[in-house]
């Protein structure tokens, strides 16, 4: 019967909802009370096999897992776990090998430039030959091989040398730590007297040549004497305050030329004496053999260049495949990439704690120096190799669709998400001046011209400088903390705090941009950078750096989101990938690379603390200049046309990442929105300016107030100039508006496309709207506009 059939009493809407639910469920509708698809009844044994709680848990946690996205999550976790366990510690490892800050900065910074150039090349190769999976696996294999090669480099020799330089002036010498003074001479006859001999302070006698080898605290003295034939002097070591040990003693007699009568003939005796002295520990220091350090530096540089060229494209390819898996739900990319940040933080913390409990014995050439406490960083390379091998195994499960593999995405190293589909018809797009028709005429050179303007060029410069600061911090923060006796456990805690702050800023960056605007977010980022760098420069205890690590999210994640969103709003969707690629190159490529290399040179000459202080002051100067430029040269109304950023990807990755889901507010053509705006609230200054009882110009007694007031007047004059330009263009816009509401004598009715067009397109800025209000009549609400349009047919009949 129909009354017993539960499906028969469902309405059409309920039937449609049920059909959508069944199609959306990947397991065809497993619920808490499963019903058979037909009139069959399940057996009691099958019903009792799966308990109610177990079915509910499976449905919530396991049923809707996408296997493809699970592979991406696991890959990101292992890959960034390997990356985070090794690369933040590489500068400290280079320091332990004896390299200078400039050498370490070059080894770290050159990776960004090679990566920026090689990733597009391998992307084109993978797309052209349809070998994306082969290129991916080969690049991951290069990650393992070339980075493991760095970990097994033999460190340079340590030598113990005195801090006080010797009094003798060095001459040409082949060894950097060998001091060869000028030829000295002693008296022709050396007796076995017991006079004391001070350290390298021999009297200038004829026939003595002394070779001092500083690093070993060892003196090799060669005595060339011309003794008398009858009484050959005996050479004995001096034993007053210094212990001399004769290593080798050889005599090479030779016959001297004939001498005048009355003089005796002499023989030449050469003696090699090596003296070993133990100096107090406060008078000696450890140095590296510079020739060995330079050889190690060149070997690692070649390994880094070759390895980075072959391995730079791995993350770009995986980003592209992951976005293909996501399909139209590409705004969830950040949820996949977040697993990489989780793995980075956990691996860095675990490895840092583990290294603190390892020590290696160092062989020192010389005596008197205290052995340094060196860590065994080979453990880091072993962990890196294991984790990257796991990522390589996971990468074998990726599935590639080559018909969706785009060169443009790899070339720009960005994956740009298209906007919401426009619902306007073809007839409307031909007659209505939409943003799409405008963007077709917007070529690449217009993009370059736009980005070179004062408004957007200043934002690009700030993006480059923030990348410069991030590259410097990534390379030399742990270097500076180790100088303050910081441990690798501290480095791991710093990494966890910075990643937590970046994830937090990632989730709330779009809310912050919506609340205060893009430019003010850049202000806050520059101010936080200033406070952070100056604070680090005055540290005395390494652990006190932790409070400032929470600013990493503001100084990097929020800045990245604001720059991406601000520049994407300025260009049409067709050129948005190019704009984001330029920003990617300036921030992640050129910015970080310059920060590592130029920062290394500055640290080498001025020290880490002074360099942090200098970059902090530079941040303050750039903040003031940027604020002045935005205040004078950029109108306030530009902020109303910005684009809010949703789901900006986690920007802690040092490799290229995708940019996703930029939601545009003002140019949506889906449905016209009726959003009446209240008149802007006037400031106190504007009220005083409009008050007829007060003079138009008032000079304050304070010179600073007068100066600021003069700058404000200059800004108002520049604003008035723009208003005049807008008023000159306004009649053309009025003509386009008349197509929507023609005058009474027009005699033509507006078409359906003009009726539903977005009025915001005909009014590009609130400033132009204000100019039209002052020229014609006050603006009326949208409802009154529609009433006038309804009254047009009667007027058109006349």
UniProtKB/Swiss-Prot annotation:
**Which gene is this protein's source?**
MFSD6
Instruction: Mark the transmembrane ranges.
Output: 74-94, 106-126, 133-153, 295-315, 344-364, 378-398, 459-479, 488-508, 516-536, 553-573, 588-608, 614-634
Please give, as recorded in its UniProt entry, the membrane topology of this protein. Answer: Multi-pass membrane protein
Q: What is this protein called?
A: Major facilitator superfamily domain-containing protein 6
Low complexity: compositionally biased ranges: 38-50, 760-780
State the family named in the UniProt similarity comment for this chain: Belongs to the major facilitator superfamily. MFSD6 family.
Where it mainly occurs, coarsely classed, is: membrane
- Region labeled Disordered — which residues? 25-50, 671-696, 732-798
Q: Name one GO cellular component term.
A: plasma membrane
Protein's UniProt keywords contain Transmembrane: yes
Q: Which residues carry this modification: Phosphothreonine?
A: 11
Write the record's keywords in alphabetical order, separated by commas. Answer: Membrane, Phosphoprotein, Transmembrane, Transmembrane helix
What domain of life? Eukaryota
Q: Where in the cell is it found?
A: Membrane
Tell me a GO biological process for this protein. Answer: antigen processing and presentation of exogenous peptide antigen via MHC class I
UniProt source species: Sus scrofa
The record, for Gene3D superfamilies, names: MFS general substrate transporter like domains
